[in-house]
Structures are given as C-alpha cells and as structure tokens.
Amino acid sequence: MEKLKININGKVAVVNSSGDTPLLWVLRDELKLTGTKFGCGRGLCGACTVHLNGVETRSCQTTIELLEPDDEVTTIEGLSKDNLHPVQEAWIEQDVPQCGYCQSGQIMTAVAFLKRNNNPNDEEIDSAMKMNICRCGTYQRIRKAMHSSSEKIRNGQK
C-alpha cells in the first residue's frame, strides 16, 4: 500500500489505504470521521455524501486513487469551522431528523445545492434532494428547513 495525502476538512491527512479503497471507508475507518454514513454502497441513497471541491459526491463510489493532490474533501465534521452551518441550524429548528442516519448526507447535499441556488422553490428543492433517501420520510421538514436556511444564507449568515 502506498501512502496517499488527502486534503480533508482543510487539513492534509496521510492515509495508508490502497488506491481502490472508497473514500467512505478511508474517512470512517482510517480517519475516524464517522459522520459520513454507509447506506447502500452503490451511490443511490446519499447517506455517504461529502463535498469534493464544493460539489456533492458519493464517497462510497469515489476511490481515493481518483483524488488529485489539490482536491478538497469536506465532510459533515468540517462543514463549519466555528458554529453550526445555517443548514444545520435549520435542520435543528425544523426538527428534521428522526433516526438521523441519512441526515449528514441530506445536509451535505442541501449545502451544495444552496450554494448554487440560494432562493429555491419547492420544485427545485425536491429535484435537488430526490437522490437522498430518508426512510423516516422527513421530506416535508427537509423542504421547510431548506427554505429557512436559504433565508439565513441570503441574509448573510455563514
């Protein structure tokens, strides 16, 4: 195995995994960043979503050999440096999580989407979030939280 350097949450981590290892398992097993969850292992449910250079990415389908030296990976643990991100705050205010398992992936998808569209309508939210599965069915609360967090973002809260 070759040692690889990966920029995760603003810090360079040296990992000892083979290049064909999915990023998800490097995050969880080697780096102990367990906020990113394993759901389906096929990139279909969204529980494993992280940001790769600011874009939502399924970490279960992204092998570490695909990462370039200047790539930046952000996990739920690195989403906000000081306080909670506005999306995280809205998730709490709207009481979105039930079991909470899918929520880190939901939040990471929402944050990336709201960077592209900070004033979405319901249809745009549903379209952006449709690849994230919540078995508890909290989709209505997710929509409310996204409207609330988009307002926070538009008002300058970071």
Describe the function of each predicted region.
Residues 1-158:
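Signature of N-terminal electron-transfer/Fe-S-associated modules in redox systems
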